Amino acid sequence: SLMPVPRHARRNIVTMFMIMLGFTFFSASMWTGQELGIGLDLKGFVEALLLGGAILGIYTALLAYVGCKTGLSMDLLAQHSFGKKGSYLPSALISFTQIGWFGVGVAMFAIPVAKLIAPDKPWVVPLLVALAGICMTGSAFFGIRAMTIVSYISVPLIAMLGITAMIMAVRQGDASLAEKFAESQGLGVITGAGMVIGSFVSGGTATPNFARFAKTPKAAVWTTAIAFFL
């Protein structure tokens, strides 16, 4: 939209929190967590998560405040900051990186699911990629209402899946998680924090696209900061 989001179209804090969680619960971030778990000991793992999550949370919370206060999308805010022609570069960069993560996301969903349900049928992977892509594109096409519905369905499911996976890892592993974290593989805490930030800083820059639908700046800031920190 080329206009600020009107007051009657704003969403309450619970809905915004679910939308932001749905935005940040992403397979690439889960992959980053896996790499940190391999490369760091338990202390370094926690420090990298806290440092990277805090920086990412503060950065996106500031963008959320501006987005909610103005009701404008990231691209329109870029026009105010850099002018119409100057805004082409940041808009193009964000669009390019988001298209790339879109492809990564659907592939990280389709490949393991295909291996689980039909390991001997290679055509299942492109089919699942197409279906996932249609669903993701459809939610964006139909706007905030569709994203709200998807978030209310997907966030609890992803949370339950994550908890179940952790429980299974503890029960089936040949050593406790603490023992597996006992030794670092040489990855530094700062590098780990950089991985946390880098895994979602591009998507986080587009935070105003979502936060502009919050009723108050306080709701936008808190829901965004908590979602990105988690």
Feature roles, as predicted:
Residues 49-82, 91-97:
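Juxtamembrane transmembrane-helix boundary signature
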Residues 1-43, 187-193, 212-222:
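Membrane-interface "cap" regions at the ends of multi-pass membrane proteins
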Residues 34-39, 64-65, 89, 108-119, ...:
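Membrane-water interface regions at transmembrane-helix termini and the short interhelical loops
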Residues 28, 54-59, 94-103, 157-168, ...:
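Selective recognition of specific alpha-helical transmembrane segments in multi-pass small-molecule
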